[in-house]
Amino acid sequence: NIAGGLRVNDPAIDLAVLVAVLSSNMDLALDEKICITGEVGLSGEIRPINRLSQRIKEAEKLGFQRIIVPDGQDCDITGLNIEIVKVGRVTDAFRILFKK
């Protein structure tokens, strides 16, 4: 469950929620043009998700310039105006998102 009673059944939101909590805790703003997706395993690995290509296309339509996605998952997309950044672990995502 997400705060406020919103129920989420899609594990692809795991990484985005984790990053949002960390961002709030560290009082650091994220770039508003970054989309984040990925399931987070108990040991911090970012697991593959369903419908990745569809999610990337939709993120581009919504105006995102960059999307963080699970490493090791094929996304056979060309011709889009969005940077696809692959991460294998939570620490990789944090380094990319919170670099100074």
List the predicted regions and their residue ranges:
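Peripheral, non-AAA+ core regions of ATP-driven protein-machinery
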Residues: N1-K100
